[in-house]
Design a protein with these regions (language model features):
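Tryptophan-rich substrate-binding surfaces of secreted polymer-degrading and adhesive proteins
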Residues: 1-95
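Extracellular/virion structural assembly segments
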Residues: 2-18, 79-99, 107-310
């Protein structure tokens, strides 16, 4: 018996480059742009526009030293606000700021078919609109989803009076595959300081007949939890990563293609969509290992251990 009647979907994300970015309302104004003639002090931060990264000065009297090459004078902090939703971290967010603090918009030209998209670690948003616009056929996909809060428990009392929680992610897997040259437009609307942790999209591969019951999901917590010599507990809250163990029914005629595909994406972060009804079975990360059991003449079983990114 399977937990999901649909196949396991694996999305190998498109690596977003500056050449793909057609338009956005997120400016690169986190810090001043680095200038060769400016003197920087210890701890001062700058942006290198050529790679959209933030760097921090490691010394005083820092002048004329290129952050890209002078590694004893500069340390890389991370991407600019514009590019945080495209890095390999779910925790870091692109935040709506500047003159427009309630919308985040991107127009991208991936140069390939996009059949699935996920927005992860989204905070303070009310809606997300995704469109595919082809130069010849016009708008070929247009869908808007809501981030309206939902009751934590079922029942009429909880619907009207119980606690509610806002979704932090949205997944779209119904995008058409016939428009490889279409522009991808993504628009978020929300409250002040809205943030998007990861915007992941690409072509999806489907394998198997469904996930078996017995799937295990959880998190790996990287918080600091120590006890001092006097018995005091020291707690420092840090990032966490989702994790999951899936057992998948597969047809034996797709066994080789599954193994070859998984081998090709080793150590590559992908989007894993287990069962649509359980948000916990949707992860952005990599598989640690997998095993395929040829159990029956027509069907087999595949066990996957997946670790999400922080």
């Amino acid at each position: 018996m399977s937990i999901s009647p649909t196949a396991l979907s694996i999305v190998h994300p498109v690596a977003v480059t500056p050449a793909m970015l057609v338009a956005t309302n997120i400016a690169e104004t986190d810090f001043p742009a680095w200038e060769v003639g400016t003197t920087y002090t210890l701890g001062q931060r700058v942006i290198v526009l050529s790679n959209s990264r933030v760097y921090e000065s490691l010394q005083d009297s820092n002048v004329g030293r290129d952050p890209l090459t002078a590694t004893t004078w500069w340390i890389e902090v991370g991407p600019t606000n514009r590019w945080r939703c495209f890095d390999r971290s779910v925790t870091s967010q692109t935040v709506a700021e500047g003159t427009d603090t309630t919308t985040i918009s991107y127009t991208l030209r991936p140069g390939q078919a996009v059949t699935a998209l996920a927005a992860l670690n989204v905070t303070n948003a009310t809606s997300m609109r995704v469109r595919l616009v082809d130069a010849t056929h016009g708008t070929v996909y247009d869908r808007t989803v809501s981030f309206a809060s939902q009751p934590l428990q079922s029942g009429w009392w909880n619907w009207f009076f119980g606690q509610r929680q806002q979704p932090t992610q949205q997944i779209m897997t119904d995008m058409p595959s016939a428009f490889g040259n279409a522009d991808l437009l993504v628009d978020f609307v929300g409250g002040t300081g809205m943030g998007v942790g990861a915007l992941v999209f690409g072509s999806q591969m489907r394998f198997g007949i469904g996930l078996q019951y017995g799937a295990r999901v959880g998190i790996q917590d990287y918080s600091r939890k120590e006890t001092s010599a006097f018995g005091d507990v020291i707690l420092v809250r840090r990032a966490f990563a989702k994790r999951a163990n899936f057992d998948l029914f597969i047809s034996n005629n797709e066994l080789d293609s599954l193994q070859n595909f998984l081998s090709s994406i080793r150590a590559v972060p992908c989007l894993w969509i287990g069962a649509d009804r359980y948000e916990s079975t949707i992860l952005y990360g990599f598989y640690k290992n997998f095993d395929v059991l040829i159990a029956y003449p027509e069907h087999g079983e595949c066990s996957l251990e997946i670790e999400g990114l922080t």
